[in-house]
Amino acid sequence: MVTRDETAEAEGLRPAVGSSRVRTYQVRTYGCQMNVHDSERLSGLLESAGYQRAAEGTDADIVVFNTCAVRENADNKLYGNLSHLAPRKQADPNMQIAVGGCLAQKDRDAVLRRAPWVDVVFGTHNIGSLPTLLERARHNREAQVEIVEALQEFPSALPASRESAYAAWVSISVGCNNTCTFCIVPSLRGKEVDRRPGDILAEVQSLVDQGVLEITLLGQNVNAYGVSFADPELPRDRGAFAKLLRACGGIDGLERVRFTSPHPAEFTDDVIEAMAATPNVCPTLHMPLQSGSDRILKAMRRSYRAERFLGIIDKVRAAIPHAAITTDLIVGFPGETEEDFQATLDVVEQARFAGAFTFQYSKRPGTPAADMPDQLPKSVVTERYQRLIELQERISLEQNREQVGRAVELLVATGEGRKDASTARMSGRARDGRLVHFLPGDNEIRPGDIVTTTVTGAAPHHLIADAPIIERRRTRAGDAHAAGQKPRTGVGLGMPRIGAPAPSATAEGCGC
């Protein structure tokens, strides 16, 4: 294992050493929204260091895997893909493979034991080291493994190459102070570290200046925001997240604000008040339930109970009547009885979720739940999972049918859901987050534009709007998407940058 070299600097590194050809890269992302945004940062780092994104369908000189360790098949997926690259690596020793993210943080040296052709292994706390590690591996002709145990300061200085011209992730924190027994994330991403509000708002402003219309505030537990920079001598200000939402409401040109994910135990009334009072905060809430059984919630070490969860939903709907509420659910947690599972079905029925991400419990080594007795047979978990899916699909369809006849404002998107090509429908997201497939008619509509149309049909996972367009608005985001331009950010906290300086956020041609 190669230890971290504190004196190594990526500044000025160029990947085409000894060659006039610019080397290309590809980032493959597995897992949650955190990983998606981390991959944008990895792309920004590589581009700042002189690499170029590989064209679609071409072989990249550098392949970076940004991994997930939450699901049971994460290992198989990674090592299967690494095996597919082994012949390419053998044929072209100058090709490089890097593995980062949660699985790399967890497995460390095991990655090289199982796939010795990998060049770089890096963790969740040092993604900024990637250009340096790649160059060092090439120069030394030796694999580099660098894992940092803890994040001391939020890495706001890292540039990001965004995937969308119209919508963007903005991290407000990393890590988590909760200790859910099924979750390995806190041990891999560490304790919560929050960004200062000024740095968050500066990044949001930079994105809006480039034409971005929608931002999603991102954290493992967004409504615990502020805990890491609170004065330990003073009572904790639990209103920091609500204040942040209201501050986003004051940014001209920012049309939509979303956030994910809150924790029910930390959810306070001031957040609901801020959601209702801030016009650009979208009428939607994604809040993980995980189980409707109080006994299982206790075993999961989730510090709330079903009654509190349902109480929060009631308050949200009282303040924001048309809010779309979604959740996460786990089926088959160790020791879950039929009675426990029925409690989950009962809460789902009462909550009337617009949608739910449902998971079969996945045993993860290193978590307390993995060592619990009464692990359920796969057949039982699968049968319960199917019953839960059937219930939620029915509720989702009923909820979506209530939207038929309503006018909806859509932010036109690309790559959203499956559409029948023969209908020539486009897709967009309503303000409440629902996916809508709509007919553009004779209008020239681009991803990033805003349209208003009428819902004419419903399915469990989407709405149909085949009515004529009521209104359309061309946007700078639409202009940028059409021109192939995407925003870049690199808002700093005084930390040294990696690689060449990122372009100015207001540089001509960014128009997105």
From Swiss-Prot:
Enzyme Commission numbers on file: 2.8.4.3
Binding of [4Fe-4S] cluster 1, residues: 32, 68, 102
InterPro entries assigned: Elp3/MiaA/NifB-like_rSAM, Methylthiotransferase, Methylthiotransferase_CS, Methylthiotransferase_N, Methylthiotransferase_N_sf, MiaB_methiolase, rSAM, rSAM_horseshoe
Cofactor field: [4Fe-4S] cluster
Record has tRNA processing as a keyword: yes
Residues annotated to bind [4Fe-4S] cluster 2: 176, 180, 183
Region spans: Disordered: 477-512
Reactions catalysed: N(6)-dimethylallyladenosine(37) in tRNA + (sulfur carrier)-SH + AH2 + 2 S-adenosyl-L-methionine = 2-methylsulfanyl-N(6)-dimethylallyladenosine(37) in tRNA + (sulfur carrier)-H + 5'-deoxyadenosine + L-methionine + A + S-adenosyl-L-homocysteine + 2 H(+)
Annotated localization: Cytoplasm
GO molecular function: 4 iron, 4 sulfur cluster binding; metal ion binding; N6-isopentenyladenosine methylthiotransferase activity
Free-text cofactor note: Binds 2 [4Fe-4S] clusters. One cluster is coordinated with 3 cysteines and an exchangeable S-adenosyl-L-methionine.
Cellular component GO terms, alphabetical: cytosol
Residues in Radical SAM core domain copies: 162-398
Ranges where the TRAM domain occurs: 401-469
Protein family according to the UniProt entry: Belongs to the methylthiotransferase family. MiaB subfamily.
Subunit structure: Monomer.
Function: Catalyzes the methylthiolation of N6-(dimethylallyl)adenosine (i(6)A), leading to the formation of 2-methylthio-N6-(dimethylallyl)adenosine (ms(2)i(6)A) at position 37 in tRNAs that read codons beginning with uridine.
Protein's name in the database: tRNA-2-methylthio-N(6)-dimethylallyladenosine synthase
Organism: Mycolicibacterium smegmatis (strain ATCC 700084 / mc(2)155) (Mycobacterium smegmatis)
Origin organism lineage: Bacteria, Bacillati, Actinomycetota, Actinomycetes, Mycobacteriales
